[in-house]
Amino acid sequence: MKKLFLVDAYALIFKYYYAFMGRPMRNRAGMNTSVVFGFTKFLRDIQKREHPDLLGVAFDPKGGSFRREIFPEYKANRAETPEDILLSVPYVKRIVEAMCIPVLEVPGYEADDVIGTLAHKGVEAGYDVFMVTPDKDYGQLVCDNCKIYKQKGNDGIEIVGREAIREKYGIENPQLVRDILALWGDASDNIPGVPGIGEKTACKLVQEWGTVENILQNADRIKSRQGEKIAEWGDKLLLAKRLTTICLDVPIDFREEDLTVCAPRIDELKALFAELDFRMFLNDLTNLAPAEPLPEGPRSSSVGLTGSVSGRSYLIWFTGCLAETTTASIPPPSTGSLFSASASARVTAVSRLHTTLRPSSISPRRAVFSACVRDLS
């Protein structure tokens, strides 16, 4: 079955920032490069390990989302974004774009919503979908062909499917994760839960009664003070569910040509990795030896891309593997917007890339990374 990988950029960016906080990596200019290194390595490892047929990296847009409009206190409790993250994000984007991996960004919607919509459509199109994120709210999207893909330890991976959701929450229907979160609340997003109800109680209530709506209808049948508190919370509980629900109707089309990855722009990557002092990645690029010239991917555009879409499928092996290039059968180029007129997503995509990367020798920089990344699980 073909595989679609969708990466929640900011979820990983914050995770790597805090994982490396005690001993950050820095380049010769003194810049904290931990986030960029961790993100790049994990993205590279996904390509090496999984060979995704389709791949996209979703970013939260500037200006917030519709959730702030319906609940002004949404995420209002968060401290200012650390300066090291603010400095790292542009580099992460530049590297993703130079790798010619599609960048997904829709005004008014968070990355969760973009990923949720594309994951839903991807499953309908017959793909095995993997959502690359450590965030628990993605559990509501899990189904037979849609799973959470998480880093575990240094090089380990945890796949969260139906069984894992069942074991964690005691529910058969993963969609009910949003109801558990609504009852419990989400402190990181400043979504208040019902007073006195924690995770365990929320799970028990949902196991017995199902959705938040049904729980409210039967609040008078719930023993002790819990039923009274739930009834009093009323509209706040319904609002919390709306806030914790990941959208599946973001105005973005699912088209394979919009989520394919073309040949990386090697010169750009070399310049970026040299500036960041990423010797391990520079060595990989130096040893890249395609059998024939590869087409360069398109430059990104903040207003979207239009024009013809065509391409070839390349299998690129790094040192230690056979270098070969294969031509795939591709339908005639299509002309027009990469997205429908209603979609405001930015996407960089032309042709598919399956990348296998050779294991690099252990360097002091990698040793620091290995020591820090153990905290990620």
Show where each model-derived region lies.
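Long, highly charged low-complexity segments
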Residues: 255, 259, 264-314
